[in-house]
Amino acid sequence: MFHPRARTMLLLSLPALIIGVASSLVLIASMKVASVFQQFLWQRLPASIGIAYDSPFWIVGMLTLTGIVVGLIIRYSPGHAGPDPAIEPLISMPVSPSALPGLLLALIIGLAGGVSLGPEHPIMTINIALAAAFGSRLFPRITALDWTILASAGTIGALFGTPVAAALIFSQTLSGSNDIPMWDRLFAPLMAAAAGSLTTSLFFHPHFSLPIAHYTQMRLVDIASGAIVAAIAIAAGMVAVWCLPRLHELLHRLKNPVLILGIGGFILGILGVIGGPLTLFKGLDEMQQMAFSQTLGAGDYFTLAAVKLAALVIAAASGFRGGRIFPAVFIGAALGLMLHAHVEAVPAAITVSCAILGLVLVVTRDGWLSLFMAAVVVPDTNLLPLLCIVMLPAWLLLAGKPLLAANRHEP
């Protein structure tokens, strides 16, 4: 009835569905626990002792304590809470399962404590390791690489609430051939991503889109404006690219994770006092608050973008377990709103989307993911042709440039 190619795809469907659902459940459970813990640390606990949650004392103290606790976990837990996200790429080969409890605990405490990183890197590491560990026993004929692809696709679908991002990302890595078309290779990852996104949607809907005025019609001047905005965002991102490896090397000369992360948490607390509560945490909810605010001006947006960028570099250089995509989206949104406030003739839809495109491109060096994030934050079909055109000079600017990553150090 089915061609052998179709039977092969159907055989992978069940593992893909299981991995997609499981990847989403790991993300949902982690985020729920972190959210409950965050409410306790930043609302109930300070209220019970009569301290404002946004007071300098509480912000500095909480982030310093968060750094110390995460440092203790990294130093003493088996596997040292997994790989350092500042060194490893988002998608990598499976780590030892023994490192996962420490990694999950470090992630939850970091998210709840206000560290300016997202959940994507640790969740990806956890899901890949679990998929490889359990999948190799249940389906021994499937290789570790296939489990890595399925788990990463399911996680991407769960993180962004749609399988589109996974389809775009893997379309450039799972290339087809004369014998096996690209869509044959994409079938199982796309099914895992769809299962992950649908499972996530049953529990909550990620809110990426901002209330920005509709973009009516593309003009030639808008293309030039968008390219300039993207270039400004790339320039800001390249400052982080220059700082991260140097700061990472400087901090890790101390050798002691408790000391390194304690210092990192203290600096994050100082930055939190300067930027305010909006610059804390992973950035998605704070981005919504920033966009809905009626009191922020160009100077405020600049402060938010600069502080969040500095916090991203400090958190990554210190070794906190977290990802950099969500904070980059916040920085891009703040930068775009600032540029629109300075030059109101350029629509906010252009400044925000192109700034996000530039920042995410610096962080991920992935054109499809950058286009996707810009399009979901400013969901306007009239912008898509402009974003595709703006991507071209942005990609040229970054060709051959170093990545936002630290160098490995000898122990």
From Swiss-Prot:
GO terms for cellular component: plasma membrane. It is a multi-pass membrane protein. It comes from the Bacteria. InterPro entries: Chloride_channel_YfeO, Cl-channel_core, ClC, ClC-type_chloride_channel. The chain crosses the membrane at residues 9-29, 54-74, 99-119, 149-169, 186-206, 223-243, 258-278, 296-316, 322-342, 343-363, 386-406. Keywords: Cell membrane, Ion channel, Ion transport, Membrane, Transmembrane, Transmembrane helix, Transport. One of its GO terms (molecular function) is monoatomic ion channel activity. It is found in: Cell membrane. Coiled coil: none annotated. Gene3D superfamilies: Clc chloride channel. Pfam families: Voltage_CLC. SUPFAM superfamilies: Clc chloride channel. Belongs to the chloride channel (TC 2.A.49) family. PANTHER family: CHLORIDE CHANNEL PROTEIN CLC-E (PTHR43427), ION-TRANSPORT PROTEIN YFEO-RELATED (PTHR43427:SF9). This is Putative ion-transport protein YfeO. It comes from Salmonella schwarzengrund (strain CVM19633). The lineage of its organism: Bacteria, Pseudomonadati, Pseudomonadota, Gammaproteobacteria, Enterobacterales.
